[in-house]
Amino acid sequence: MIILTGNQKGGAGKSTLTLLLANYLVQEKGLDVTVVDMDYQQSVAQKFERAKLLENAEPYQVVAASLESFPDIRHMLCNHKEQIVLIDLPGKLDDDGLIAVFESADLVICPFSYDEFSFESTILFSVVLRKINAQVPLVYVPNRVKANVRYETKVEVDEQLALLGLVTPALPDRVDFQRVSTFQTPLAIYPVAVNAFESFYEKHFNL
């Protein structure tokens, strides 16, 4: 099963969400997970290498790769039915290397925030994705939501995105998210992360 984490807008929280989901699938569900870091900043791969210096056996592997390399490495990543491959995509849409990745996706998770630019980028990402892979399920994760801010567009945004896919419970804006690693999710944010992921696990993970 190939799961993409993506949005056209950089800084949407793709890499952190990828780590949160990987930790959830391994620690909560006991699944076999491999993370492929295709983001240009390679922040997930860098965290993985740093954590290996401090911890013992890693709970899952992280592989740094480019979009162009995907057709060559796909068969090695998905070597058995129960294998979960999480791909952290670059924050862009103008690369033909995305086509093969989009075509292979079984599920796409899209973090977004409640501002106009993020919403427009999220819609554009979704439209392009669906032109390439019309049947792939989409899951939208409201990210970095501030508790003391009234988002006037929230209801409208949720309604529009719900026409395209599932909108999960929101992830709050907390400093603890900066401490997520390839080995653990901080306890302070673990419940909210689990709540978001449980909202779509049963429907989309037919393992």
Kindly label every feature range from the protein language model:
Residues I2-D37:
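Walker A/P-loop phosphate-binding motif and the immediately C-terminal alpha-helix
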Residues T34-V35, I87, C110, Y140-P142:
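Structural beta-sheet core signal
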Residues D39-Q83:
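Nucleotide-state-sensitive switch-loop elements of NTP-binding domains
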Residues C78-L98:
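Switch II (G3) loop of P-loop NTPases
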Residues D96-E116:
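Inter-motif core of Ras-like GTPase G domains
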Residues E120-L138:
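Conserved C-terminal guanine-recognition region of P-loop GTPase G domains, centered on the G4
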Residues R144-V149, V155-L187:
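Beta-strand-loop-alpha "switch" segments that mediate conformational coupling across diverse proteins
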Residues T185-L207:
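NTP-binding/hydrolysis catalytic cores, primarily Walker-type P-loop NTPases
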